[in-house]
Amino acid sequence: MEGMALYLVAALLIGFPGSSHGALYTLITPGVLRTDTEEQILVEAHGDSAPKQPVISIHDFPRRQKILFQIRVDMNPAGGMLVTPTIKIPAKELNKESRQNQYVVVKVSGLPLELEKVVLLSSQSGFVFIQTDKGIYTPGSLVRYRVFSMDYNMHRMDKTVIVEFQTPEGVVVSSNPINPSSVLIRHYNLSELVSFGTWKAVAKYEHSPEESYTAYFDVREYVLPSFEVRLQPSDKFLYIDGNKNFHVSITARYLYGKKVEGVAFVLFGVKIDDAKKSIPDSLTRIPIIDGDGEAILKRDILRSRFQNLNELVGHTLYASVTVMTESGSDMVVTEQSGIHIVTSPYQIYFTKPPKYFKPGMPYELTVYVTNPDGSPAANVPVVSEAIHSEGTTLSDGTAKLILNTPLNTQSLPITVRTNHRDLPRERQATKSMTATAYQTQGGSGNYLHVAITSTEIKAGDNLPVSFNVRGNANSLNQIKYFTYLILTKGKIFKVGRQPRGEGQNLVTMNLRITPDLIPAFRFVAYYQVGNNEIVADSVWVDVKDTCMGMLVVKGASSRDNRIQKPGAAMKIKLEGDPGARVGLVAVDKAVYVLNDKYKISQAKIWDTIEKSDFGCTAGGGQDNLGVFEDAGLALTTSTNLNTKQRSVATCPQPTNRRRRSSVLLLDSKASKAAQFQEQNLHKCCEDGMHENPMGYTCEKRAKYTQEGDACKAAFLECCRYIKGIRDENQRESELFLARSDFEDEFFEEDNIISRSDFPDSWLWLTEDLNEPPNSQGISSKTLSFYLKDSITTWEVLAVSIAPTKGICVAEPYEITVMKDFFIDLRVPYSVVKNEQVEIRAVLYNYADEDIYVRVELLYNPAFCSASAEGQRYRVQVPVRALSSWAVPFVIVPLEQGLHDVEVKASVRGELASDGVRKKLKVVPEGERKNIVTVIELDPSVKGVGGTQEQTVVANKLDDKVPETEIETKFSVLGDPVAQIIENSIDGSKLSHLIITPSGSGEQNMITMTPSVIATYYLDATGQWENLGVDRRTEAVKQIMKGYAQQMVYKKADHSYASFVNRASSSWLTAYVVKVFAMAAKMVKDINHEIICGGVKWLILNRQQSDGVFKENAPVILGGMMGGTQGAEPEVSLTAFILVALLESRSVCNEHINILDNSINKATDYLLKKYEKLQRPYTTALTAYALAAAERLNDDRVLMAASTGRDRWEEHARTHNIEGTSYALLALLKMKKFAEAGPVVKWLIDQKYYGGTYGQTQATVMVFQALAEYEIQIPTHKDLNLNISINLPEREVPLRYSINYGNALVARTAETKLNEDFTVSASGDGKATMTILTVYNAQLREDANVCNKFHLNVSVENAQLNSKQAKGAKDTLRLKICTRYLGEVDSTMTIIDVSMLTGFLPDTEDLTRLSKGVDRYISKFEIDNNMVQKGTVVIYLDKVSHSEVECLNFKIHKHFEVGFIQPGPVKVYSYYNLDEQCTKFYHPDKGTGLLNKICHGNICRCAEQSCSLLNQQKKIDLPLRIQKACAPNVDYVYKAKLLRIEEKDGNDIYVMDVLEVIKGGTDRNPQAKARQYVSQRKCQEALNLNLNNDYLIWGLSSDLWPMKNDISYLITKNTWIERWPNEDECQDEEFQNLCDDFAQLSNTLTIFGCPT
């Protein structure tokens, strides 16, 4: 009777019908609720006027075990029976580790009917932004950043933020918590060994890391330019049908505002997909005059490159422009890309078009017309077809069309086209869509249309909002008011009502636009008809992006707004909201020339914030519920009107001078060609008279003609004719040198203070506006500072965050800094040690008079230059008014590191002067190479005794450049052991498990079990959204029904059988206990006495003294027992019942005193049997029972019973799944997460979704095991590694501790050594150690292995006239000769020529080689990027295998680079890339280079006069003693010249030290050979002869310590006199000299130098 009574009660509860009331109760919430955020919701009682006090409560989902928030409100007629309580869901109460969506239940009680809505939850509670001080950095520099944080009300928020820095490869190298209230500014140090590319700074809230904000910045080597270049195409597109040439205007301005004089090189091309196809014939040199120039792409040049222009439609044109200053000192490369090649010049888009229309009511459509590059197209007429409407686009490219829709139609096709009068109809742009009719509720025909017709809306406006209704008269008469909600940033901002008078079909209200509604809002309105129908509409409204508050940066006075001097004092004034915190930074505008993509702006702020809108359309909806859903709202009513359950917070995304000889030559060519009247022969003659770059004879050239014998004859005749004329012509060149000398009229350089502080950014400050506000409510603050030394324009950017008005980015304030006379010292980012380079000091004179300037390069021993110690190098130059002059200085860096280059200049007769000191980075010679070694640290597998110790052997670096550093970087990254498997079983496929229980005591449990386990799994994995969150209520009802029905089969002693009159079953009773215990975790109404009664019966009636459980009455339906039936039955049954007891422990431990004892007895029994078990199934089941009882922590027996360590197999598939599931549970209980991974994968691969009869145990266990895996894996912290790196140079090892929380943050360290070291790891988990070794390898030109090709490359000077030189500073002729080494000719061969820096190829030569009758090449392409070395790619149809074939063309130098690095030339087969050969070429190194003396890779400057002291007259003994005893003289020797050697362009004099007269640094040199190194040019001046003796001494600075001895340099400071031999000393001519030498030797040897 008791069981039947419970069943009836449960049935009544489950089947209680919904009550019918005369009112409509409504609950509306945001479609997504945010944690820790105040949210407004709406509760309304329509048709009920009785005061009420509803209780709004928030519960966890799915189990509803916690009340997260609760509030009671007053609902009364005075408030319109409408309340808008504010709720707040605390994040601390939720599962932070869950990887699934989380939901809450919003419940309203205290009304005649309860309202309940399951709402998606978001843990993101605000916005966080990062600002870096600039958008581009160099290796080793400092990235400054600041963090701004605010909530969804735009209030400043001080929640902890995690900031991560990620490399371009996505590796997190830094992760730090920041509290924005205490630390607004932080920095991150980039190492020298840093990845180039785009980095990320990612900010996210500590408790909601799934939402983040990312700031980007680039890392690369760069030097700031001194000017910027802007390109402006004549059109934003190339119209394919047009005939106009394409023009690009070039504007170049110095960053301090003055115009640039110079030259531009322009190359056009077409980008097809991702490949750039250059147009070589378009390469032109364009003068930049007064800052402007224009490039033109002619249509015929485009057609010559691409015959079928229609094939280019859909691709883009680009223009690559390189602008160089007149002095050649600076260069900026820019590109105008994205110029679309089109058939129609416009594109049409629909801007958030409403998907649905209301028949018979206006339909508003906003169209957006763009140019092909995506920019807005203004003043373009547009027209809609079918339903006619027309308009013209505004400046922002938009036009609003209003379509009057017809009645009684369910579909509305819409086509809009441009209506430009200059375009034919087929070239007009069109766009089509189809809108669907709004479906009224129950076909009532009631409509609401909300109209907002204003175009540009801004804060402060009064916006008219119209409510337009249509429907039957009876329905309209019931409308007393409209309820409206205003949503912004995903929150309900305001709720109100607009009254409606009787008979009004159109009602209008004014809405005040406040700053809170920026950047956009949604206006949702609805009315009720009766107590059942809701009619709704909504509209999305864009508001002009401005600050909610205000922030202005300006000069504090008119003086501060003028052009400033470097280093001057000035003031700026900040004006903004009271209490605002302002972050400042001043950035050199040159930074934005390199990269302006990442600068923070107000628009970027609002773009991010606007993404918080949970609405997904521009307004409207498919029906009344669709209106709420699409606006981002959740609704439920007392009449079961429910919006669909939302499962994602985001919206789906919808699917850029001429010589006379030249004239004569032209006349000769014309007259000769005129002799051939036929057009084809005329061209053959002309081509024969073209100069041949390769220098081939006329006869050899004729072999390449392919146009027949007549053409070849004409070609040969004309070629020989013109050769005779050319042989008579001569070329000449001029060189002009000027000098002026007025030394006394210049300002002394020692009194000039050099400018040296040139930061990219500075003024990185944070200021609080705490001053009392003025009458307009504005606070202000004045800041004083000194400007830096740069001549530029500084852009001061200010970003504020106010207490209640969010973030405001002020308009940048510019500070221009310059002088009438100054130096711009242009130095590269880095130079290579011992390689010559030219730097330029550009003198700018912005005065109205010409000036004369003296320039001095200051001496630095780290460089070899014309400036030497004690010897100034000065140059005097004239500089015209309003112009510049470049003074070149050639230097050779001799030492690695950062070294000062300093130049000073003064103006003759004036006080005007300037000085600049900059750091020049000198890097080692050779090619930078990387060696990467990866070590896996896994001490549990690879260790001994829990510790893995490994020796890392140093790399063999045989090709390292001597005396250069090795840099080794270690990076250790943890590896979370567990394999996270998202949605391991798709919850949407479990629908079949929620069924209605029925049948006998066994059948009922069989049919109840699926609902229990499905609910258990979906609760644990958070996948109800896949099945439908409403299905959980249904599942709980089915569980309760099965629970109630099972009571029928419960006996008085709490045991169970299939039928009441049948003997009680141990297994069935245990199973009921287990299932009910699981259900009790999900359903509150299961009585613990029911569970514990079964437990007590099992212990008292079925457990034996040895702990084993017996079965006296097996179940009828044996299939429901799964694998427990079969061999080893006693162990299986005992283990199964033990599992049930353990499941019930949390419920029954307080009620059954003997429970623990029973569990211990059973575990003791199982432990005795465990290692002897034969069945994999029984082993797995027993292992789980023992592990759950905390009596087993060793998985060896369990894993030994497995197959492949991932499954426990028997004869039946379901038994395999069941047994493997037990094994997985056992591994999880034992915390063997690494071993659990493969098991989980095997179970998932089975794609088993369960069933009922015959599958009960497999179903229960697989979902219980996978649910447990989902629960434990995110929360387990089984990663605790201690890593120690023992480096030879460190006394203390590097130690790192890695755990689950910091696993993905790389730990890095660097060392300069390349030696063996050891790394040891202990603890749990895995980690990866990456060792990056970077060194400089020697460049070996002769090491290039050539395969199948012979290649020779050479250069020679080309003497040209000014026209041929095309304005170039110099011209070389490049000769490339190759032969294929195979048995037949090589077809389709490519020659890749890298240009020398500063050089461009002669396109006329290349064109002649490819287009003449005598074609030598198939085609060529130019990649002209002069930031790096440009490239010419030459295509050959074949390369001969029998003879050498040569190509010859000119290359022009357009700017100086001093030391020119070799350029590679590579020839390779198109079809076989392994067949290739590379050679290098460079100009004559013996010309114009500074002299230096080198041993190995160590060089000394030798740019001084040769030693001429031995030629001095009137030298006596006192003078010799005085000079030899000078403080800086290191040694005095008598030495014999043994031999003279030549090495690296220097002379090496090998001398035998006969006598040490004055000892120095070199220890024991007597009777030993020593090397004296001298420049080759000093050989004649020294005139040293073999076997002669010499008196020689030198300075300590001229000693060169080598590995085992010392070498000596012969410089201008070296004293050398020939010491006559003994026979000569007897001659009267030499007697006095010999006596002086002997006395000098005795004096210095015996007495030393006088003090």
UniProtKB/Swiss-Prot annotation:
GO MF entry, a single one: toxin activity
Keyword terms: Cleavage on pair of basic residues, Complement system impairing toxin, Disulfide bond, Glycoprotein, Inflammatory response, Magnesium, Metal-binding, Secreted, Signal, Toxin
Residue span(s) of domain NTR: 1506-1649
Disulfide bonds: 547-808, 616-651, 684-711, 685-718, 698-719, 864-1501, 1346-1477, 1377-1446, 1494-1499, 1506-1578, 1525-1649, 1625-1634
Subcellular location: Secreted
Binding locations of Mg(2+): 519, 542-543, 545
SMART domains referenced in this protein's UniProt entry, alphabetically: A2M (SM01360), A2M_N_2 (SM01359), A2M_recep (SM01361), ANATO (SM00104), C345C (SM00643), Thiol-ester_cl (SM01419)
Main location: secreted
Protein name: A.superbus venom factor 2
Classification via InterPro entries: A-macroglobulin_rcpt-bd, A-macroglobulin_rcpt-bd_sf, A2M/Complement_sys, A2M_N_BRD, Alpha-macroglob_thiol-ester_cl, Alpha-macroglobulin_TED, Anaphylatoxin/fibulin, Anaphylatoxin_comp_syst
Start and end residues of each stretch annotated as C3a-like domain: 661-739
Signal peptide range in chain numbering: 1-22
Annotated Anaphylatoxin-like domain residues: 684-719
A Pfam entry, by short name: A2M
Region (Factor B binding site): 743-754
Post-translational modification: First processed by the removal of 4 Arg residues by furin-type protease, forming two chains, alpha and gamma/beta precursor, linked by a disulfide bond. This mature AVF is composed of three chains: alpha, gamma and beta.
Expression sites (tissue/organ): Expressed by the venom gland.
Residues with glycosylation annotation: 189, 1282, 1352
Chain residue ranges for the region called C3d-like domain: 992-1269
Domain of life of the source: Eukaryota
Positions of the propeptide removed during maturation: 657-739, 992-1269
Function, as annotated: Complement-activating protein in snake venom. It is a structural and functional analog of complement component C3b, the activated form of C3. It binds factor B (CFB), which is subsequently cleaved by factor D (CFD) to form the bimolecular complex AVF/Bb. AVF/Bb is a C3 convertase that cleaves complement component C3, but not C5 (as do CVF/Bb).
Source organism of the structure: Austrelaps superbus
Additional observations: Is expressed in small quantities.
Positions of region (Factor H binding site): 1197-1259
